[in-house]
Amino acid sequence: MISKIDKNKVRLKRHARVRTKLSGTAEKPRLNVYRSNKHIYAQIIDDVKGVTLAQASSQDKDIANTSASKVDLATTVGQEIAKKANDKGIKEIVFDRGGYLYHGRVKALADAARENGLEF
């Protein structure tokens, strides 16, 4: 009998494999994306110090009150994380898609962050 593939387990293995090659510094921190079925989260992380520099999610008060589609919420989260990064003087980042395909909500977040001043 063929067992069913656990997609999240495969994603976590892919993410771990990529993270060995991908790291953020103070000059060029890492933009990490986590996507659940209902929400999307983004963090800008300095891996050298192990510190989160900025974060935004679809559960933030100003974002969660809008009744929009999940892709629209991801776009808003991308705009918000870019605004917070610009306030802290962060212009360049390393994009970590978290093992997810660069499509849909992850792509919408990345495109919105690029349009609002982040370079990656």
Curated annotation (Swiss-Prot):
Q: Which SUPFAM superfamilies match?
A: Translational machinery components
GO BP terms: namely: translation
Q: The organism sits in which domain of life?
A: Bacteria
Query: Keywords for this entry?
Result: Ribonucleoprotein, Ribosomal protein, RNA-binding, rRNA-binding
Q: Which CDD domains match?
A: Ribosomal_L18_L5e
As recorded in UniProt, coiled-coil segments are none
Give the Gene Ontology MF terms in alphabetical order: 5S rRNA binding; structural constituent of ribosome
Please give an example of a GO cellular component term from this record: cytosolic large ribosomal subunit
Has UniProt tagged this entry with the keyword Ribosomal protein? Answer: yes
Its family remark reads:
Belongs to the universal ribosomal protein uL18 family.
Q: How does it assemble?
A: Part of the 50S ribosomal subunit; part of the 5S rRNA/L5/L18/L25 subcomplex. Contacts the 5S and 23S rRNAs.
Relate the protein's function as given in its record. This is one of the proteins that bind and probably mediate the attachment of the 5S RNA into the large ribosomal subunit, where it forms part of the central protuberance.
Which HAMAP family does this chain map to?
Ribosomal_uL18_B
Name the UniProt record assigns to this protein = Large ribosomal subunit protein uL18
Organism of provenance: Staphylococcus epidermidis (strain ATCC 35984 / DSM 28319 / BCRC 17069 / CCUG 31568 / BM 3577 / RP62A)
